[in-house]
């Protein structure tokens, strides 16, 4: 399965996310749908996973929008802005980023991203 297929079917295709992107550990985009990163944001997200607790002080910025950090550990970083938010999860080779809008449930959105991360980790990614 291609990275784009994971984004299209396993993330956005679930209806629980409005947009998603998969980036490498270097911060470069591998696949995306309805979500983009501005210059340097991918690298900043990758760096944030080295000290994830910093998300509580600095937040997480995606597509120029700063989200307040609500979870930050070595696996997952979540951010929220109003009724919208993002869930990011790191695997051995990539970082999954899912965006949910005000009509979608944060818990369901995060679960979709976490489940795909589990699958990728189990399969060596």
Swiss-Prot record:
Pfam families: Profilin. It comes from the Eukaryota. GO terms for cellular component: cell cortex; cytoskeleton. The keyword Cell wall biogenesis/degradation does not apply. Gene3D superfamilies: Dynein light chain 2a, cytoplasmic. The keyword Acetylation applies. Keywords: Acetylation, Actin-binding, Cytoplasm, Cytoskeleton. Occurs in many kinds of cells as a complex with monomeric actin in a 1:1 ratio. Binds to actin and affects the structure of the cytoskeleton. At high concentrations, profilin prevents the polymerization of actin, whereas it enhances it at low concentrations. By binding to PIP2, it inhibits the formation of IP3 and DG. PANTHER family: PROFILIN. This is Profilin-P. It comes from Physarum polycephalum.
């Amino acid at each position: 399965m291609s990275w784009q297929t994971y984004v299209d079917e396993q993330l956005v295709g679930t209806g629980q996310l409005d947009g998603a992107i998969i980036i490498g550990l270097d911060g470069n985009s591998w696949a995306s749908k309805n979500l983009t990163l501005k210059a340097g944001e991918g690298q900043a997200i990758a760096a944030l996973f080295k000290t994830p607790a910093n998300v509580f002080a600095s937040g997480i910025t995606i597509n120029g929008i700063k989200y307040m950090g609500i979870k930050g550990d070595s696996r997952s970083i979540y951010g929220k802005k109003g009724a919208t938010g993002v869930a990011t999860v790191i695997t051995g080779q990539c970082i999954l980023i899912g965006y949910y809008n005000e009509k979608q449930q944060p818990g369901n959105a995060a679960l979709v991203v976490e489940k795909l991360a589990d699958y990728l980790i189990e399969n060596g990614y």
